[in-house]
Amino acid sequence: MDILLLLKAFILGIIEGATEFLPISSTGHLIIVGDLLDFNDDKGKVFEIVIQLGAILAVCWEYRSRLISVATTLHTNTSQRFILNLFVAFLPAAIFGLLLHGFIKEHLFSSITVACALIVGGFAILLVENLYAHDKAPAAKASNLNEITPWQALKVGCAQSLAIMPGVSRSGATILGGMIFGLNRKTATEFSFFLAIPVMLAATFYDVYKNFSLFVFEDLAMFAVGFITAFLAALVAIKTLIRYVANHDFKGFAYYRIVLGIIVLAYYW
């Protein structure tokens, strides 16, 4: 058993789980740290699929009561509208993802690209937060998930499509998009969590289909370590972010993105 490989799996599992649902780009962090750990080969790419699945299941577990409630009340308008909103928001990312997935993975998965996206995204967060601080942004209309309209969901889904670029952050794009298009901060954050389920599951199964031959039994221990650490770290991150957004804005994440992006650019240039 390669202890160093398991240590890399542990580190990357924590990074995936801790960053997947924060507006700082988990993919960007995995690319940067993967480069530093020399773990961006085919084995590393397959490993990312496993830890992303761990993070997805953390959302399912945290919101299991809501998911079970929706599944058992499909005949109600509330549940049907919730599913419709997720489907509508999922479509733009699915379309752009299928069209551009291969090109982006081949040409844009680099630390330099991530650094630039981190910096631009950081300033975007500051812009949105400043608009809200000066009451120039649209007033929040949806104070809970049941009040989101399909039109709002579609616009959030379009914002999410920006996250096909590594370093942008899927959660950041959906949360900020939600805030811009009429959701309050907490509702936008929770909708981002739920939207992660179909989006990330679709991406994960697509990657499994494309890379199935790279999964080997000898890597089972590495996969297990990464999966478990990603699951646990994601649970902590989800609970922490929900508490955080009750009384804080996202400017701290913006400054973190900008500083990290500058450091990465300086390191590689």
From Swiss-Prot:
One of its GO terms (cellular component) is plasma membrane. GO terms for molecular function: undecaprenyl-diphosphatase activity. GO terms for biological process: cell wall organization; peptidoglycan biosynthetic process; regulation of cell shape; response to antibiotic. It comes from Methylobacillus flagellatus (strain ATCC 51484 / DSM 6875 / VKM B-1610 / KT). It is found in: Cell inner membrane. The chain crosses the membrane at residues 43-63, 82-102, 108-128, 188-208, 222-242, 249-269. Its EC number is 3.6.1.27. Bacitracin is thought to be involved in the inhibition of peptidoglycan synthesis by sequestering undecaprenyl diphosphate, thereby reducing the pool of lipid carrier available. Catalyzes the dephosphorylation of undecaprenyl diphosphate (UPP). Confers resistance to bacitracin. It catalyses: di-trans,octa-cis-undecaprenyl diphosphate + H2O = di-trans,octa-cis-undecaprenyl phosphate + phosphate + H(+). Keywords: Antibiotic resistance, Cell inner membrane, Cell membrane, Cell shape, Cell wall biogenesis/degradation, Hydrolase, Membrane, Peptidoglycan synthesis, Transmembrane, Transmembrane helix. It holds the Pfam family BacA. Belongs to the UppP family. It is a multi-pass membrane protein. This is Undecaprenyl-diphosphatase.
